[in-house]
């Protein structure tokens, strides 16, 4: 990330991130999208995987956005995923204390991504916000379109390759 977004940690204004994930079938091909804003500077990110789940794409959107920041930042991160919001807001603390096991002593699903998200958070002060998906929130709709674009582009690559 270059320009003003790399300078984001220097000022009191937060970096604002909007994320979304998409999946065609669950599991199936999926995509993720993120919009990062700092002042008047904006960056769009997207990607996808051939065989995944919606929850993995939601997590990867947040992870990819946070990993794109080049220095410690204050972040307002918006997601329409209750799974991500609840996981990071309450479940992860017990999972870590229990050796990445659930209350039922079962392995945490998507533990690789939860651990990666946990590591990405160490550099930043993140305030998490939940927004209702497909409810007319402009940035959430744009993140959703990026996720669908990531899904489509990945699906086309997997057919060609």
Curated annotation (Swiss-Prot):
Its main location: cytoplasm. Mg(2+) 1 binds at residues 20, 58, 80. It holds the Pfam family RNase_H. GO terms for biological process: DNA replication, removal of RNA primer. GO terms for cellular component: cytoplasm. Disulfide bonds: none annotated. Binds 1 Mg(2+) ion per subunit. May bind a second metal ion at a regulatory site, or after substrate binding. CDD domains: RNase_HI_prokaryote_like (cd09278). Its cofactor is Mg(2+). Residues 137-161 are annotated as: Disordered. It is found in: Cytoplasm. Mg(2+) 2 binds at residues 20, 144. It catalyses: Endonucleolytic cleavage to 5'-phosphomonoester. Keywords: Cytoplasm, Endonuclease, Hydrolase, Magnesium, Metal-binding, Nuclease. PANTHER family: RIBONUCLEASE H1. HAMAP family: RNase_H. Belongs to the RNase H family. Endonuclease that specifically degrades the RNA of RNA-DNA hybrids. This is Ribonuclease H. It comes from Rhodopseudomonas palustris (strain HaA2).
């Amino acid at each position: 990330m270059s320009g003003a977004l790399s300078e984001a940690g220097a000022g009191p204004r937060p970096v604002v991130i909007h994320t979304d994930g998409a999946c065609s079938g669950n599991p199936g091909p999926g995509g993720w999208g993120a919009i990062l804003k700092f002042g008047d500077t904006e960056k769009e990110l997207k990607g996808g995987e051939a065989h995944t789940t919606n929850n993995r794409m939601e997590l990867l959107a947040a992870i990819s956005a946070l990993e794109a920041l080049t220095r410690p930042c204050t972040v307002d991160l918006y997601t329409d995923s209750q799974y991500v919001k609840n996981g990071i807001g309450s479940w992860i603390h017990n999972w870590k204390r229990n050796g990445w096991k659930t209350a039922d002593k079962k392995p945490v699903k998507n533990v690789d991504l939860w651990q990666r998200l946990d590591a990405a958070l160490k550099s930043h002060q993140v305030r998490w916000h939940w927004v209702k998906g497909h409810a007319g929130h402009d940035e959430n709709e744009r993140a959703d379109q990026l996720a669908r674009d990531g899904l489509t582009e990945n699906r086309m690559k997997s057919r060609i390759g």
